[in-house]
Each structure stands twice: as structure tokens, then as C-alpha cells.
């Protein structure tokens, strides 16, 4: 199956100053595009950039929030990956991005965390070898991105698939001309701590994060301030992944009909609170954080992830 990117829906162009800019984000699983880069992808797309998200697996090893689709998990029906395609398409539509799967949908399987038996599955992404890099070279050659976004060498929090996404991104980028900058999505320690401190009461059944429990970085090379429109798009793209994410703003869905409410003391630091299936309360911050992984440095007055690039 071809890896060709497909347009997933219309988008609203607010400004056209980034027309001609081509951006590719390489992510491990459905929902990563929303959690780590949703604001930047929407920011770029609504300013006219051509934005594509390459997703490497279907996220088959994920747990499920809510009772509705619990039996889709890998230990039961093993149908979660197909369901998450639908969630991803909804998220990309909200962000205004195109999407494709590395090697085609289902070629590579979610490896799970270190030590998970899924590491040994024959289609496990950690076992993808040279083929995955070749597939990404094909995509980069076709799309000719100026800007590429992925994770750092640790994958952000140590997940083997995130680390593998980093490896193939840098390997492929070194073989394709025209890529001017690679960014690594990270979580800035200062903003994260401020957001966690602002959460005064977590929803019933949730818990507060322990000290240093959530992965974060001291080094931030660029922080993107999300305006109201970009922030709203990020939250809604996260909400689209309802099997994986729970937004504590009272919203419900067919997937998760249970409302959750969090209380915060500083809405600038934590306007919205969410949790993964571990039910650890986290802030959706007003800034996204990035490290420069390779290529053109940011100008001192940079306000956008493509500032300083030429196209």
C-alpha cells in the first residue's frame, strides 16, 4: 500500500503568509500529534503551510478510557488500532493537516513499552529495521518538507516507538535534500510545574502527579504561544482521541459518557486539565515547547516554528 499523503478535510486559512511552506510531523501513535504538537500544526496550517502528519503505528497496545470500547484492546478483540484510525482522522481534520501512515495503515504495529510482549511481534515498530527509514525517505522525497517535527533521542518519555520515530526521522532527513530544520517536541519543566501547581482539585478517581513523575525538559529552544484559536483546536483534537484522553471540562462523548471536572487556581497556567488512561491530572498548557534537533537556528525574535527558514 502506498504511503501517499491524503487530504483529510478542509481547513480555514486565516493568513497566507506561510503559503508554500511544507511541514511534516512524524509521530509514533494516533493522539501524539494532538498532545505534543497540535497547537503548532494548527498554527502552521491556518497560516497557509502544507502540513502532513506521518503516523507510524495504529496504537494497538493502548488502553481504553470508558466502558464503551473496552473489549477492543489487544488482549480481547484486538480491534483498537482500526478504531483509532477514526479518532486520528477527526483530530487531523480539526488541525487542518493531511495524514498518512508509514508504509500504509497497519504496516507497523505499536510495540508497547519496554518489556511488553508486543516488542516481539513480527510487525512491531521497534523491529522495523531499514524498511521504515526507506518508507520515510519515500515520503520526504514526495512531500519535500522544509520543516520536520518529531521527538528527541529519548522519545520524550522513553517509549520505544517514539525513540524509533526519532531514529528514522533523522536517518531519512539525512538522505533527502531541502529539510532546513528538525524540531523535537518536548515538555518544558517550568510551564509544566506551574500548570501542575495550579490544579487544586482533581476529578473523582483521578490523582495528582507525583514529584518528577511526568517527563519534562529544562532546555527549551523555542516556545510557541498558542492564541485562543490554536489552543481551542489543540484541545478539540485531543478530545477526538476519546479512547485515550479524558478532558476534565465536563464534556462527554459516545466513547466516554462520564463527565470529569477539575478545579484550578490559575487558568493562565492550566486553562484545561486532562488525563491519559493512567488518570494522572495534567495541564493543557498555553505554550508548546520545542528543542532544535538539527538545522537552521531560530532568530532571536522568533514567534513561529518556521521563523528563519526560506521557501
From Swiss-Prot:
Its EC number is 3.5.1.103. Its cofactor is Zn(2+). It is an enzyme of class 3 (hydrolase). Zn(2+) binds at residues 29, 32, 162. GO terms for biological process: mycothiol biosynthetic process. The keyword Hydrolase applies. SUPFAM superfamilies: LmbE-like. Binds 1 zinc ion per subunit. It catalyses: 1D-myo-inositol 2-acetamido-2-deoxy-alpha-D-glucopyranoside + H2O = 1D-myo-inositol 2-amino-2-deoxy-alpha-D-glucopyranoside + acetate. Keywords: Hydrolase, Metal-binding, Zinc. GO terms for molecular function: N-acetylglucosaminylinositol deacetylase activity; zinc ion binding. It comes from the Bacteria. Pfam families: PIG-L (PF02585). Belongs to the MshB deacetylase family. Catalyzes the deacetylation of 1D-myo-inositol 2-acetamido-2-deoxy-alpha-D-glucopyranoside (GlcNAc-Ins) in the mycothiol biosynthesis pathway. This is 1D-myo-inositol 2-acetamido-2-deoxy-alpha-D-glucopyranoside deacetylase. It comes from Corynebacterium efficiens (strain DSM 44549 / YS-314 / AJ 12310 / JCM 11189 / NBRC 100395). The lineage of its organism: Bacteria, Bacillati, Actinomycetota, Actinomycetes, Mycobacteriales.
Amino acid at each position: 500500500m502506498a504511503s501517499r499523503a491524503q487530504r483529510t478535510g478542509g481547513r480555514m486559512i486565516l493568513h497566507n503568509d506561510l503559503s508554500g511552506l511544507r511541514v511534516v510531523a512524524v509521530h509514533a501513535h494516533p493522539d501524539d500529534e494532538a498532545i505534543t504538537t497540535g497547537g503548532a500544526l494548527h498554527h502552521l496550517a491556518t497560516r497557509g503551510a502544507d502540513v502532513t502528519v506521518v503516523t507510524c503505528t495504529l496504537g494497538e497496545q493502548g488502553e481504553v478510557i470508558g466502558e464503551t470500547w473496552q473489549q477492543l484492546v489487544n488482549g480481547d478483540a484486538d480491534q483498537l488500532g482500526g478504531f483509532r484510525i477514526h479518532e486520528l482522522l477527526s483530530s487531523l481534520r480539526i488541525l487542518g493537516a493531511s495524514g498518512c501512515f508509514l508504509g500504509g495503515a497497519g504496516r507497523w504495529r505499536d510495540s508497547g513499552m519496554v518489556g511488553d510482549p508486543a516488542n516481539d511481534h513480527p510487525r512491531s515498530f521497534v523491529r522495523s529495521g531499514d524498511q521504515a527509514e526507506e518508507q520515510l525517505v519515500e515520503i520526504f522525497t514526495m512531500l519535500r518538507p522544509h520543516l520536520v517535527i518529531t521527538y528527541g533521542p529519548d522519545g520524550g518519555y522513553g517509549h520505544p516507538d517514539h525513540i524509533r520515530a526519532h531514529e528514522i526521522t533523522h536517518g531519512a532527513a539525512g538522505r533527502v535534500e531541502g529539510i532546513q530544520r528538525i524540531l523535537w517536541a518536548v515538555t518544558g519543566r517550568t510551564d509544566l510545574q506551574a500548570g501542575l501547581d495550579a490544579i487544586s482539585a482533581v476529578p473523582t478517581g483521578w490523582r495528582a502527579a507525583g514529584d518528577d513523575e511526568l517527563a519534562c525538559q529544562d532546555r527549551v529552544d523555542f516556545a510557541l504561544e498558542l492564541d485562543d484559536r490554536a489552543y481551542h483546536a489543540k484541545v478539540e483534537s485531543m478530545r477526538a482521541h476519546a479512547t485515550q484522553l479524558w478532558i476534565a471540562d465536563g464534556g462527554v462523548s459516545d466513547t466516554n459518557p462520564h463527565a470529569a471536572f477539575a478545579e484550578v487556581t490559575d487558568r493562565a497556567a492550566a486553562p484545561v486539565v486532562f488525563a491519559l488512561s493512567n488518570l494522572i491530572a495534567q495541564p493543557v498548557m498555553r505554550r508548546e515547547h520545542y528543542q532544535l534537533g538539527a538545522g537552521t537556528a531560530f532568530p532571536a525574535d522568533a514567534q513561529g516554528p518556521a521563523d528563519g527558514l526560506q521557501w
